């Protein structure tokens, strides 16, 4: 008798083995085992039926548990490494310094109301409002601090693919785009009334972003909106008139994502043709192309000036570009499971490998040190730009299904008015000194950084991670 098992456990194991042998047509082996066990095990057809399949279930359970144990051991090792490298002083500094904050499990809130996958999220630049769009055709407005649903905004007739806050000075708007080929503008100060619908694209509109105030030479600063579409074009809109003022053609396939520079001079866009393009908005022409991805590009991001010192080191520059320069470094995420970092000339700086599935969204930390990414592998990954882009934190099982979107709450702007007077999705508007030099809009007090991110998923949930 095994010393590891009690008499009852041994008897159940024998019955399970006999039932298994009988189920796989090894009747002679089953008969032999029963004969050898003799009176120690009483088993009939009913007992065989009862124990049939039990051995396989226990075997698969053990395999699952072993995998879970390995995952937990890996997480524990990562946390221990993080703890070992920290001192009480550095831990205190991290707690006080928002530039060092990174999200960690569990989320502060899990927001549930959508009836189909969540495709996009966006933070109000001033208030604690969070907008989410879904394949269920609705936009939900949440109070992310309280974790409560404020309202459901209806108007689109097909999936909502992207949302963004921004607009002219003095009045923040919410823009949304959809598979119904339209862009809609909503007024948060008037119960999210639909104030304008922008038709014009010939296929699904996959991304929409307000262009920040201060676009060089533009008389419509703050009034511009850019959209990207499956019709292979980017369109620039005047939100006050609803007119399309410019169409940018050059991509040869679906344009899935677009990001404007902080001063509104440049657009960075990419999609199914695997070739990101940096557009000069005033000239309406491509300034640079970026070659390297091996599959569809799902997301793009422009690095803030705070990241320039770290990215300059990675790219081998002796000194970083001027903080007043608005489009020096970029990030792209792809279905090839990689994230790639680029300079403005189209040179590949670094390839980040770690995700096990499509990379769906990117966000640079406002403090400049980190890049965050989410993926269909259900994780959030935090990459440290000061450590050769080492992945310093992984939040596993962020959602129960593919993670489709990620947004960082924009920094609070000190002069924001009651209507949310800020740049695109809270991007600080570029300012000018008395001598005419442009100041770094990210050089504001660190206290303005909001340590809040939101993610959305195919599991129909929005999750908020915050201090």
From Swiss-Prot:
Q: Which UniProt keywords apply?
A: Cell cycle, Cell division, Coiled coil, Cytoplasm, Cytoskeleton, Microtubule, Mitosis, Repeat, Transport, WD repeat
Q: Which PROSITE patterns match?
A: LISH, WD_REPEATS_1, WD_REPEATS_2, WD_REPEATS_REGION
Q: Name one GO biological process term.
A: microtubule sliding
Query: InterPro entries, from UniProt?
Result: Dynein_regulator_LIS1, G-protein_beta_WD-40_rep, LIS1_N, LisH, PAC1-like_LisH-like_dom, WD40/YVTN_repeat-like_dom_sf, WD40_repeat_CS, WD40_repeat_dom_sf
* Stretches assigned to the LisH domain: 9-41
Coiled-coil zones: 60-87
Bias class Low complexity marks the residues at 417-437
Q: Does the keyword DNA repair apply?
A: no
Please give an example of a GO cellular component term from this record: cytoplasm
* UniProt GO molecular function: dynein complex binding
Does the record's keyword annotation contain Lyase? Answer: no
Q: What does this protein do?
A: Positively regulates the activity of the minus-end directed microtubule motor protein dynein. May enhance dynein-mediated microtubule sliding by targeting dynein to the microtubule plus end. Required for nuclear migration during vegetative growth as well as development. Required for retrograde early endosome (EE) transport from the hyphal tip. Required for localization of dynein to the mitotic spindle poles. Recruits additional proteins to the dynein complex at SPBs.
What does the comment on domains in this protein's record state? Dimerization mediated by the LisH domain may be required to activate dynein.
Q: Which HAMAP family match?
A: lis1
Full protein name: Nuclear distribution protein nudF 1
Give the species this sequence originates from: Aspergillus clavatus (strain ATCC 1007 / CBS 513.65 / DSM 816 / NCTC 3887 / NRRL 1 / QM 1276 / 107)
